[in-house]
C-alpha cells in the first residue's frame, strides 16, 4: 500500500490500509510480506525497524520469525483496535490485552527482538481498550509503547468528539497510563503547548515521518521548535503511509520540511536523526546507532558517487560534509554499497 493515492488520512486508511491489513490473517501471506519487507528495508540500508503489525497475532509471529532467522533487531507489536475499523480488523479490550500479553511473553527479549504495546491511535480504541493496554504496559514497563499522535487537524477534531472530557489528544493516552518515558509517538505535528510540556516532562520520544506527512498532506513537523523545548525526536519512513523505504529519501524530506519551517538541518544532524537519534528514541542507544567499540555491528556503507549527478557534486566538493550532503539529498537504494546486520554481510536483493 506504499505510495497509494489518497485524499486524507482517514480516507487513505479506509481505502487502502484496512483492506490490505485484512490479508494478514493468513499465515502464508504474512510470512511472504514479512520476508519482502525485510528484504526491501535492508536493500535501502535500514537495519532496525519499529513496526506496527496488524491486529492478527499471525502477523506478529511472521515478522518476528523472519527477523529472528536473519539475526535482525526489530521492535514490533500487534495493532489494537476495537472500534472505527472494519469487521475483521477489530478485537476487544480483553482480547487486545490477552493476545498482546501472550505475544510479549513469547517474543520480547528473545535474541534481538523487542515487543511494543501498540494501540493504533485513540480513534480506533475505546477507553476500555486504552485502559487495558495501559495496565499491560504498567505490568511490563521495559517494553516500548508505540502509537500515533496529532497527525492531521481533522483527526484531532475527531478525537475531541470521541473523548469530550480529554484536555487534548495526548490526554487520551495519558488518562489511561499510555504516556511515559518508553512511549514512542508518531507524527506529532499539531501539538498543544500542554502536550509538548508533558512529552518533555516524561522524556517520551516523538517520531518525525516527513515523507508520509507531506504525502498525505498532514502538515510540517516543528523539528527546531521541539528541539529547543528539549523533546526527544527520531526519524522514520512510516513506510505504509509514505512513499519510500529509503532513510536517505526521508532525510531529504526532513531537510525540506525544516526549510519550509524556516530552519536548516545540517548533514550531520540528518545523519544523527537517522542513526543515533532514532536509536535513542527506541531506547537502544546502548546497542545500535553509532560505530563505537562494543556496539552491535549494524552498518550501512554508502557509495557517495552512486549516480552521475551525485558523483559530479562529490568530485567538486572540497569538504567532507559537502561530499556527504548530495547523497543525503539525492541518494536512494543505488547509494547502498553494503549492509551488515549483526556483523553479517547481507546479500541485497
Locate the predicted segments by residue.
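His/Asp/Glu-enriched, well-ordered alpha-helical/loop segment
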Residues: 175-182, 223-311
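Alpha-helical scaffold segments that flank or form the walls of functional sites
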Residues: 2-72, 96-109
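C-terminal cap of metal-dependent C-N hydrolases
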Residues: 296-349
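Active-site gating loops and adjacent loop-to-helix segments of metal-dependent hydrolytic enzymes
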Residues: 1-30, 71, 78-93, 152-182, ...
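Long hydrophobic segments that form regular secondary structure
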Residues: 191-204, 209-215
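Metal-coordinating catalytic core of metallo-dependent amide/deamination hydrolases
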Residues: 58-188
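Glycine-enriched alpha-helix->loop->beta-strand junction motifs that scaffold or abut catalytic
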Residues: 71-73, 137-142, 178-181, 198-207, ...
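Divalent metal-coordination and catalytic microenvironments
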Residues: 45, 67, 117, 148, ...
Amino acid at each position: 500500500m506504499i505510495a497509494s493515492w489518497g485524499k486524507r488520512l482517514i480516507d487513505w486508511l479506509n481505502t487502502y490500509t484496512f483492506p490490505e491489513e485484512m490479508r494478514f490473517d493468513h499465515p502464508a501471506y504474512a510470512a511472504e510480506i514479512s520476508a519482502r519487507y525485510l528484504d526491501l528495508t535492508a536493500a535501502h540500508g535500514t537495519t532496525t525497524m519499529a513496526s506496527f503489525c496488524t491486529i492478527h497475532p499471525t502477523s506478529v509471529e511472521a515478522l518476528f520469525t523472519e527477523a529472528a532467522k536473519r539475526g535482525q533487531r526489530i521492535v514490533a507489536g500487534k495493532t489494537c483496535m476495537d472500534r472505527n475499523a472494519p469487521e475483521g480488523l477489530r478485537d476487544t479490550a480483553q482480547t487486545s490485552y490477552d493476545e498482546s500479553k501472550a505475544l510479549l511473553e513469547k517474543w520480547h527479549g528473545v535474541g534481538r527482538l523487542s515487543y511494543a504495546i501498540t494501540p493504533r491511535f485513540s480513534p480506533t480504541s475505546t477507553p476500555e481498550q486504552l485502559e487495558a493496554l495501559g495496565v499491560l504496559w504498567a505490568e511490563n514497563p521495559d517494553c516500548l509503547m508505540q502509537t500515533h499522535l496529532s497527525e492531521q487537524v481533522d483527526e484531532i477534531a475527531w478525537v475531541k468528539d470521541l473523548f469530550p472530557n480529554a484536555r487534548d489528544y495526548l490526554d487520551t493516552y495519558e488518562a489511561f497510563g499510555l504516556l511515559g518515558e518508553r512511549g514512542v509517538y508518531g507524527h506529532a505535528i499539531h501539538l498543544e503547548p500542554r502536550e509538548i510540556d508533558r512529552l518533555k516532562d516524561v522524556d517520551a520520544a516523538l517520531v518525525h515521518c516527513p515523507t508520509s506527512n507531506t504525502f498525505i498532506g498532514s502538515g510540517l513537523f516543528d523539528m527546531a521548535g521541539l528541539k529547543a523545548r528539549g523533546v526527544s525526536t527520531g526519524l522514520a519512513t512510516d513506510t505504509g503511509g509514505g512513499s519510500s523505504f529509503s532513510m536517505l529519501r526521508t532525510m531529504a524530506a526532513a531537510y525540506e520540511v525544516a526549510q519550509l519551517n524556516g530552519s536548516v538541518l545540517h548533514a550531520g544532524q540528518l545523519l544523527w536523526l537517522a542513526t543515533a537519534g532514532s536509536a535513542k528514541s527506541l531506547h537502544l542507544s546502548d546497542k545500535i546507532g553509532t560505530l563505537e567499540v562494543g556496539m552491535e555491528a549494524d552498518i550501512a556503507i554508502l557509495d557517495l558517487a552512486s549516480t552521475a549527478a551525485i558523483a559530479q557534486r562529490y568530485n567538486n566538493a572540497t569538504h567532507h560534509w559537502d561530499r556527504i550532503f548530495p547523497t543525503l539529498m539525492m541518494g536512494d537504494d543505488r547509494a547502498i554499497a553494503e549492509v551488515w546486520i549483526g556483523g553479517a554481510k547481507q546479500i541485497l536483493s
